[in-house]
Amino acid sequence: MAKNEKIRIRLKSYDHKLLDFSAGKIVETAKKAGSQVSGPVPLPTEKQVVTILRAVHKYKYSREQFEIRTHKRLIDIANPTPKTVDSLMRLDLPAGVDIEIKL
């Protein structure tokens, strides 16, 4: 690969433990392949709140709130080798983690 290339990996998940486990696995695999790794960098957590009425017809002031949090991490791999890319492609990560890769 070219000299000043880098791979940027963004991970998203609702479960922060699963996200940290996946990020650790990616960092460990990239370091074993001989690349420079920076991260995982925690990005701001998105919080989505939904408010609904508890009763169907009346009791407007009785409401219930639900929230869902999206946790994010960023990993940069500088000067990746072909061995690094191959080992990252073979990596088996758990379901529930969204992975976005930019070259």
UniProtKB/Swiss-Prot annotation:
Q: Which domain of life is it from?
A: Bacteria
Keywords from the named record: Ribonucleoprotein, Ribosomal protein
Read off the Pfam families from this record: Ribosomal_S10
Output this protein's name.
Small ribosomal subunit protein uS10
Can you supply one Gene Ontology CC term for this chain's record? ribonucleoprotein complex
Q: PROSITE patterns from the xrefs?
A: RIBOSOMAL_S10
One biological process term from GO is:
translation
Function, as annotated = Involved in the binding of tRNA to the ribosomes.
Cystine bridges: none
Cite a single GO MF annotation: tRNA binding
Give the UniProt family note.
Belongs to the universal ribosomal protein uS10 family.
Q: Does the keyword Ribosomal protein apply?
A: yes
Query: Self-association or partners: how does it assemble?
Result: Part of the 30S ribosomal subunit.
